[in-house]
């Protein structure tokens, strides 16, 4: 890769640990049915496309597109969209949604850490709660910079460490620790880490805190949906014995109660994320 060198100030990670984490994550995202949860996040894709100020006819690459929230939003704005993910089942869900909405776009299986596109191929690159989960963070950031045209923009939506989803993953990590040396995905939700990944010599970073609101019938309903359909939570419970599952469930219910602003028995939980626009120099 033309921009794959490690960024200054960021220590290298043990390759064996990154490989183990990547294999674990692939299994997690391939399990359950992420689209059940992912489609509720569609508003984030619409907001990010507006923040990017997309222009009709421009080329857009959606990296780790999942079920296509960003891709569909960009296609609605008459962009030429290529949706990529390394989990084929997720791309199939995105295809189903595009067909239902009668939107034209391209789909390609691809690894965010090794994108199969030439340098400066796209006017825009984006990732919504996707690239932040790559084990080799520097490599994934370098790939986004590489495929985006000079003068183009990269748009990201990343959960923050202190928000609800950031705390969800922190809670899970206490019960199912990641491989040694792995960096938290939620670091992508901090300005300091973004400035390491996208240094000022290559890009300018504008990060705006936003809130996505999870709305469920109750906290128990939310937990049931996430345990059944959201791969990382499903897999976490699957690695624990009955006692461990009970403890984790109790802690997640406590977490939901702490963030819940509803007082009528339902669940209304804001979760902070960073909406990021990166201008490629």
Outline where the language-model segments fall.
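Class I SAM-dependent methyltransferase SAM/SAH-binding core
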Residues: 59-114, 139
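A short SAM/SAH-binding and catalytic strip from SAM-dependent methyltransferases
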Residues: 123-137
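Conserved Class I S-adenosyl-L-methionine
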Residues: 186-281
